[in-house]
């Protein structure tokens, strides 16, 4: 019975998250991934540039669906006479109700916080400000959870630890979420062509890897052009020294690439998938490279002199 109840709870959480995705698809917003947690989940969408109305509908879809599930399980609980089914539905209607109410708290990154941000964004016409306020509320809520958890650890049998863990997690995610919006706001204003490096060293594709290592062991640069393809030495694993460089280099069609007029934020998002270097391509040819180091330096400079509120020293985050 316990396994069945746990399975149904997992399905409930999954359906909660899928409801977000369903609304996103209806709004023609691409959902890249769904990550589940024990108190809900996160639907990874392709863009943060959402209309407030779209974000609001996406946000409330999950809690509303959980409320519907809670109602269905409650009706089964009060009308079904089977002992096993009654026990399971009693457990499920309460947990779905808790899931819905918890996620309706107006603190980012919970669903209620996203809905709250959408309302603020519609009012202020400023996503960064809306996120800062919603994230601040999220941190306050997270702090309350941690406080209750610590209190519970001294007054109960230790169940308060879960509150501490959930509160700490929410506090961290609230901060990261605001950081991501600030990063996008900064780097969206910068064009790739102002940051890209054009002078990429060209190597002969017939050169053997062992010769490459001997000649360029002390060269700080890891990015090279080989027969029109890109060689990122930092990504090369253990290989036979007799392998030719043109066998290690990667063609444009297999790379994540950007154009010179694209934003630095697009390069920032791709840098994690490209070994820290994103090739800039025009008319089918590599004309430059944007490195993660250059992006981070520009970001650090902007953060130092632009005075963004509520943002502490930034560390690289998953994007």
Predicted regions and their residues:
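Small-residue-rich helix-interface/hinge motifs
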Residues: 1-55, 91-110, 114-119
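Alpha-helical transmembrane segments and adjacent TM-loop junctions that form the membrane-embedded core
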Residues: 90-183
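Membrane-interfacial segments at transmembrane helix termini in multi-pass membrane proteins
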Residues: 157-201, 205, 305, 310-317
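Short glycine-/small-residue motifs
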Residues: 233, 286-292
